[in-house]
Amino acid sequence: MNPFWSMSTNAGRKRSDGEEQSGSGEQRASPARPPFGKKQLPSIPKNAVPITKAASPASSTQSANGTHASYGPFYLEYSLLAEFTLVIKQKLPGIYVQPSYRSALMWFGVIFIRHGLYQDGVFKFTVYIPDNYPDGDCPKVVFDTPVFHPLVDPVSGELDVRRAFTKWRRNHNHIWQVLMYARTIFYKINTMEPLNPEAAVLYDKDIQLFKSKVVDSVKLCNSHLFDQPKIDDPYAISFSPWNPAVHEEAKEKMFAHKRRPEDFNKGLPVSGLSWVKPGSTQPFSKEDNPLQT
């Protein structure tokens, strides 16, 4: 028998026996005891005020994204790592991104526009990810130099991302989609509910003046291309003028990485079309090899 339970029970019995006699020595009938083996809760006193128990400290450790605070940072880091892996696999055309060295919630990027109204534009930007990702709002995209565009704030340079992602849904929306949207706006102009009303009005009513301002905006952004990054970070994207001593070797390695003709017979995956001769862009330039008997 548990000694603590035995001691508590005996003490209760002694109090009950002592309470049966009043101060004047009068005998008082003891209350009926419940049958053996049953437990009975005491009655609730009248006008009793309920006492609210303080919340347990463990209940406050639940983070905003539904994960326990003890492993919440690891969950966030894993989510961002998975997102960056998706960006790499998508091979977004003309878009390059690099996570910050100081914070995984900040990514540096640049967009190259090959054709259209914003042709030859090189736009550097920064992606800001909420700290409760992926359960928070959609990431923000802010251009280093505000671009003249209906969906870009002319002062802050922030892109209207909420237009495409009104409500961020985890496991459905991804950061690579935000990056692709940031590229698409330069090819498909939308003037509904603009952040830059001037750009929207000119695009709808004076396209020539709009094009002129776009050309000036592209030149302005390109003129700041070699400036030092606005954020002091070792992984911030920076550009430098062409230096043959540095860049020529890298260029040669890029162009030298070509498949040799003998590699095509080794069962390796072949890129391109089978009727094009390796190293040539001439259609049907590949000679047919006669079958050996």
From Swiss-Prot:
May function to promote vesicle trafficking and/or fusion. May also regulate apoptosis. Transmembrane segments: none annotated. SUPFAM superfamilies: UBC-like. It comes from the Eukaryota. Residues 75-223 form the UBC core domain. The keyword Disulfide bond does not apply. PANTHER family: UBIQUITIN-CONJUGATING ENZYME E2. It is a peripheral membrane protein. Keywords: Apoptosis, Cell membrane, Cytoplasm, Membrane, Protein transport, Transport. This is AKT-interacting protein. Residues 1-11 have a biased composition (Polar residues). Residues 1-44, 260-293 are annotated as: Disordered.
